Amino acid sequence: MSDHNEAVRVRISGRVQGVGFRMWTRDEALRLGVTGWVRNEADGSVSALIAGADSAISAMIERLRRGPAGASVSGVETEVAQLENMPRDFRITG
C-alpha cells in the first residue's frame, strides 16, 4: 500500500444507497491505491474515510462526485481526518 500523506472524511448525499455505491467505492479505492472504509448512514447518505497520497485522494473525491451508474450524487462534503489508526486496506464497514 502507498504511504499515507493525507486522510479525508467524506459524506456523499443523494441517491447513493441501494445502487451499489459502497462496492463501487471499494473498487475505485483499490484502483487508486487508497485505504480506508465506506459505510451507509441512517440518513440515507454514504460516509467514507480515505487515506493515501494527495493526488490519489483528489482523484477519489472526483470519482465520488460522479458515483456509479444508477447513483445520483447531490452533494459531497469533505473534512481533514487524523492519520492515526488508519486501515491498511479499503473495507465496506456497514
Swiss-Prot record:
Keywords: Hydrolase. The active site is at residues 22, 40. Residues 7-94 form the Acylphosphatase-like domain. It catalyses: an acyl phosphate + H2O = a carboxylate + phosphate + H(+). Its EC number is 3.6.1.7. One of its GO terms (molecular function) is acylphosphatase activity. Belongs to the acylphosphatase family. Coiled coil: none annotated. PANTHER family: ACYLPHOSPHATASE. This is Acylphosphatase.
